[in-house]
A protein has these predicted regions:
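Short basic/aromatic active-site micro-motif
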Residues: 69, 157-158, 256-274
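Basic/aromatic-enriched alpha-helical hairpins
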Residues: 1, 17-85, 101
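C-terminal secondary-structure termini that scaffold catalytic or DNA-interacting sites
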Residues: 11, 16, 214-224, 231-236, ...
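Extreme N-terminal basic, low-complexity initiation segments
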Residues: 2-12
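Active-site/catalytic core of tyrosine-dependent DNA strand-transfer enzymes
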Residues: 137-144, 187, 205-256
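Basic, Lys/Arg- and aromatic-enriched nucleic-acid-binding interface segment
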Residues: 81-95, 105-172, 176-177, 186, ...
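Short, polar N-cap/turn motifs at the start of nucleic acid-interacting alpha helices
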Residues: 182-189, 257, 276-296, 318-328
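Catalytic-site neighborhood detector that most strongly recognizes the C-terminal catalytic loop/helix
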Residues: 137, 191-197, 285-315
């Protein structure tokens, strides 16, 4: 027998006691990852460039019924994929683990996959260790070249996005998901959707404020139905993949590769030059409290965060030789 029905955004079929995802696991994995690179099948046309795509790390699992997701199969899959792309495989495993947890929360499908499958010892020992790349951080002597190249980008939205990313230390998704309703120009604050606390309020520093005001002046901003600050022509309407713009800027500035997460890392590192208290930096960046006192006894007001955040911004701009905050693209 076959029973079909919608579960969230996903169509599932119950086939002889096993769950098979229509479109396989693809739709759910895409919803979780916001990117097709993990589940792309081989032979599909590339969205950028020419030629067919290579299979994503999850592609070999997409056609399996869930009942076949056993520790042995997952361990074998990890063993194969980790050989050529360990970091991407580790991320794909985390997406798969999230999928398994989701499936086990649905009453209709509980018991089809063992809930502790992803925690099996033989599976866990095959998961590649993700380590941050050495040097994935801007040095203070590189700031002038970086800002010059980023501000020269033809796309003002990508240019502003990259600068805001560096000057707030926020996660890339937190900044790309900003709506204009999250920006308070009157009280100089930004509301950020935080994966740790749900949301956090951080200062809207002077230079970042000017950057965002300049985006409001871009023509056709009214066509942005979702009210995204950093809009694009993508299906979601917001900026999704700014890496290409950043890579062009790095090439122009003759700087080594720095990831978008490296810009977040740069904020935390550069803040040490101004001797910002560690707890202040952590609260601005949205890190978990690392000590008992931080967790239970520190409730810093926005003005205190602003005092230090503006010092960091001013120091970075001075090192970048940007003397006038209004002097920008």
């Amino acid at each position: 027998f076959i029973v079909g029905g919608p579960v969230g955004d996903f169509e599932l079929l119950l086939c002889h006691g096993t769950v098979c995802v229509v479109g396989k696991m693809r739709d759910l994995i895409l919803q979780l990852s916001k990117s097709s690179i993990y589940s792309t099948k081989p032979g599909e046309s590339k969205k950028r460039g020419r030629g067919p795509t290579s299979p994503g790390p999850l592609a070999s699992l997409l056609d399996r019924p869930l009942s076949e997701l056993t520790p042995e199969n997952i361990a074998e899959w990890l063993s194969t994929e980790r050989q050529n792309r360990p970091t991407v495989t580790a991320h794909a495993y985390r997406l798969l683990r999230a999928f398994i947890k989701w499936a086990n929360y649905q009453k209709k499908y509980q018991g089809i996959i063992h809930g502790d499958l992803a925690q099996d010892h033989n599976v866990r020992k095959m998961v590649p260790i993700s380590a941050s790349k050495a040097g994935d951080c801007l040095q203070k002597e590189q700031l002038k070249s970086w800002f010059s190249a980023v501000r020269s980008l033809n796309n003002p939205i990508a240019s502003a996005y990259l600068q805001v990313l560096l000057l707030t230390g926020a996660r890339r998704e937190e900044i790309s998901s900003l709506r204009w309703s999250d920006i308070d120009f009157k009280w100089s604050s930004m509301r950020i959707k935080d994966k740790i606390e749900g949301e956090r309020i951080i200062p809207l520093t002077p230079y970042v404020s000017d950057l965002l005001r300049s985006l409001m002046e871009i023509p056709n901003r009214g066509t942005n139905e979702e009210n995204w600050v950093f809009r694009s022509n993508s299906k979601s309407g917001k900026i999704i993949e700014p890496c290409s713009a950043h890579n062009r800027a790095l090439t122009r500035a003759e700087l080594p590769h720095i990831s978008l997460h490296g810009l977040r890392r740069s904020f935390g590192t550069l803040a040490e030059w101004v001797e910002v208290p560690t707890g202040i930096v952590a609260q601005i960046m949205g890190h978990k409290p690392s000590a008992l006192a931080e967790k239970h006894y520190r409730r810093r007001p926005l003005d205190l965060l602003r005092k230090w955040h503006e010092k960091v911004e001013l120091w970075i701009l001075e090192e970048a030789k940007i003397k006038n905050n209004v002097d920008k693209r």
